[in-house]
């Protein structure tokens, strides 16, 4: 069996819309979706955590679509940047460059990136709870390593199509030179210490930090799958292991420094008492 993680932001009809992921359309008339099994899907978003079909049907619970969740997140975190950039455009008399938060959500450079996780095919897969456990552990590790600059906005476990799979959407961000938080992928990855695949060569389409980041994510996923007893077909993932080992080394050094500082403080306290 294969474990796959595919990423993208847009297709021939423009940027991907999260309505497909949280089933905000008439599933009864969709050929590839089993409407009855759709009630078993599991959803998660960054504001409410886990939700289910039953949660949506409860009139006492606030119901927000993934589209609304992403809009709220972008307004909360990037509105100040949009306003400040528009003000700078007015100063330089280039108001044609003005943008809105909605524009950030529609532009394929600043909109959320979508990842699809799947193990196996229609003929051979793993139980949904196994996929759920593996990907949930992956998200915890993802947050630990990248959470300062990459934010998971929402995800859905689909059990209503041929093979169980998960659609997840995230945004890369960091501060620009004006100190404003804004969506920017390459700069966010640089801030996280993600190296170029070939550091000695110039950055470009075939040599960028996103390639290393994706390799790191694949390495983490396969490590977690192995812990669950799965031995999956794996293509070489160059750079992923090196980055993780480097991060573990940095963390170990930080712990050693903290322990040394705490010991020094204890010694100072003892000196004062004596």
Question: Which stretches of residues belong to each language-model region?
Answer:
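N-terminal nicking endonuclease/strand-transfer module with a His-rich metal-binding environment
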Residues: 1-272
């Amino acid at each position: 069996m294969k474990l796959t993680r595919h990423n993208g932001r847009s297709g021939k009809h423009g940027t991907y819309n999260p309505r497909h992921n949280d089933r905000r359309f008439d599933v009864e008339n969709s050929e590839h979706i089993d409407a009855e099994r759709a009630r078993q899907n599991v959803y998660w978003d960054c504001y409410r955590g886990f939700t289910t079909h039953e949660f949506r049907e409860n009139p006492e619970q606030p119901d927000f679509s993934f589209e609304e969740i992403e809009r709220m997140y972008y307004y909360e975190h990037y509105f100040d940047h949009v306003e400040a950039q528009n003000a700078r455009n007015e100063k330089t008399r280039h108001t044609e460059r003005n943008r809105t938060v909605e524009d950030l959500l529609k532009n394929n450079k600043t909109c959320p990136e979508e990842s699809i996780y799947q193990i196996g095919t229609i003929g051979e897969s793993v139980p949904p709870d196994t996929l759920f456990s593996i990907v949930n552990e992956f998200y915890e590790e993802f947050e630990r390593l990248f959470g300062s600059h990459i934010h998971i906005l929402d995800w859905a476990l689909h059990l209503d199509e041929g093979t169980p799979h998960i659609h997840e959407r995230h945004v890369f961000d960091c501060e620009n030179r004006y100190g404003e938080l804004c969506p920017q992928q390459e700069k966010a990855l640089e801030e996280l210490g993600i190296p170029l695949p070939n550091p000695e060569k110039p950055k470009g389409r075939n040599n960028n930090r996103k390639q290393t980041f994706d390799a790191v994510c694949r390495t983490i996923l396969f490590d977690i799958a192995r812990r669950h007893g799965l031995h999956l077909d794996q293509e070489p993932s160059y750079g992923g292991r090196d980055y993780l080992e480097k991060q573990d080394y940095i963390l170990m050094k930080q712990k050693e420094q903290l322990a040394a500082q705490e010991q020094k403080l204890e010694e100072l306290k003892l000196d004062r008492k004596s």
